[in-house]
Amino acid sequence: MRYTVMYKKRHRFRRYLLLCVSLFFVFSCSQKGDNKKVVVLAFDGMDPRIVRMMFEEGKLPHFKKLAEMGDFKDLWSSIPPQSPVAWSNFITGKNPGGHAIFDFIHRDPETYLPHLSMSETIPPETTIEPGSYVFPISKGQVILKREGAAFWEYLNEASIPSIIFKIPSNYPPVEAGDGSVSGMGTPDLFGSYGTYQYFTTDRMDIPEDYSGARLTPVDVIDGAVREVIEGPENTFRREPVLNTKGNVKRDGEGNIKYKNPTLTIPFTTWIDPENPVIRIDLPDQKIILKQGEWSDWVVLSFKPLPFIPAISGICRFYAKEIHPYFKLYLTPINVNPKDPILPIDWPGGFARKVAENAGYFYTQGMPEDTKALTNNTFTTKEFYVQSQMVLKERNRLFDYLFSQFKEGFFFFYYSSTDLGSHIFWHLRDKNHPAYDPQAREELGDVIDQIYQQMDRTVAKVLERLDDDTTFIIMSDHGFSPLYKNFHLNSWLERNGYLALNYGKQTGSLLRGDIDWSRTRAYALGFNALYINLRGREGNGIVSPGAERDRLVKELAEKLAAIKDPENEAAVIKRVHRREDIYDGPYLDRAPDLLIGYDWGYRTSWESALGDITEGDLLEVSREKWSGDHCGATEIVPGILFSNKKIRMDRPHLYDLPPSIMAEFGIAKPDDMIGINIFAPPRVPVERELSGEGISRLKALDYI
């Protein structure tokens, strides 16, 4: 079943008036040349402190050259500095009150249940269900939940061509002049952010607790492993849900509960008894791999019904081990860019054009398989190899797309700087609990290596730079270490703000363990804290107005006073009230408080999903996910380079859209809050930080 795309309604009339004004400016500026270009390279998570350290070591010559040509400044991120929030600031020129993305995780205030913030897939409203079959009468929809227009939509209306490749928080992608492929937020064929499959004869390979994977114990029989590749659900079929005794489950009204079965493809892996070689037999192809070898992209076709078109996906196999154990890894099954079942591109067919010219590529939003590492399916070196494959693939795509770019706006996104910093921080930080001297000796400082690889991409743009081109390099945030996790919901419970059902010592919001009749505040997401507000939450008990405001003030003061008992360091640097930092039509959707953690601290994974745990409130982080950026905004600034002078001391992400539009002579709309970074302000712009200010940032040691 293919899905249609639904976008939020735009204020078309207001934009039409703006377009008329903008076209006047475009016409007036046409004497400067008809070949105006703006190139933006986005290196997610690139940190200005690391950049400056590498400048001193002479390791980033092309970044340095660009800074000397124009400028280099810290770039102020969003509050909170999470990627979906930050990129939405950049896309819309607004803060979260204007675009309604506040965290990776949002919640339904009526049910309290969490959901992903960036997009939503809605199944067909109308179906006919004869027996075990399901036939949709209407189409399903994929909704982009970010509000507000993307700035390149104004470029489109002024007939400025644009290429937007892999920008986060843009699935499904909004219209872009020449073409767009969606980035972070794009699911795999399961509808997840990335679920890999792993087949192993070693039962010890399968941990008790894991996520983001389908791990299958297998046996070798007659020299072969016979298994199936699991695909998406077959939405054209249904089968009864059975309980543990094999009986059909029914709902409260006595109706049978149904589920969609999983589509599968059988395969047989033949194992050479003497050599470390396997042959994978699929229904329409055979693949030979040596131990430690990766396959090329493999096209899979899942057939829901004989008369229904197949669902196409792509994947890669990795022969992790052949002897003495059999261990076979399969990437998440990605949407096939040559035949996408989901709306990953605009216009339809653009992803196919890219793949036909540059080869198949990961279409899932976050291709580096961090789950395979944290589940211990990958070693650190194996993750390094896989992440380098992603980077080389992205470079190949850049080379093709940049070769096609002649005029207008070009945006290209790299994820390697972000995922690499999340995972490999522990290799550069001897103070980190997960520091691994053996991996450091083997792999070196991987973050430095990735930055140097990005420097080579910068060189490619500098080679083509001309007087008609504005070149910008940016990141959405920087990085800090993750030394300890803070169990925020546990703190709320122990301090009387959150109550568990009677008899419970620990619990989970997802399992219904919270007593909402006695709960005044709860946390969901990485930086969000909500008041259990009467009239907003399904079982709210705190009255709006004075009672709510007193509670918000009390919580902010107590949270800011929390210290690490081990060293008396502040755990939380700053607590923001939403009304102090946001404005716009979606302020009422925001969390009541935004928690800005101090250097080295972050919300625990458990608390982010609403869990209440026992034990210490602070837990040492020994995971390889060792770098993070979900702290206070001022400790993780991004980078901003340009071949033009930046005439602002403290540029923000939301300043970039009006700056880019101004390069094409397009006036910004009234609801964009940013300022043109290349134009001297007519009135001095005051953007003082609360607390110590920007000087505190520059005084921070990197490690």
Predicted regions and their residues:
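Active-site-proximal N-terminal segment of extracellular/periplasmic enzymes that hydrolyze or transfer
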Residues: 30-72, 81, 202
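Low-complexity, glycine/alanine/valine/leucine- and proline-rich hydrophobic stretches
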Residues: 601-656
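Bacterial N-terminal signal peptides
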Residues: 18-26
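Long, internal low-complexity/basic segments
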Residues: 34, 610, 650-657, 661-667, ...
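C-terminal motif of bacterial Sec signal peptides marking the signal peptidase cleavage site
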Residues: 27-28, 702
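Beta-strand elements within well-structured catalytic alpha/beta cores of enzymes
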Residues: 35-52, 66, 90, 154-155, ...
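A long, amphipathic alpha-helix that forms part
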Residues: 32-33, 51, 384-410, 426-473, ...
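Secreted, luminal/periplasmic, and some membrane-associated catalytic domains
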Residues: 43, 57-58, 70-74, 81-85, ...
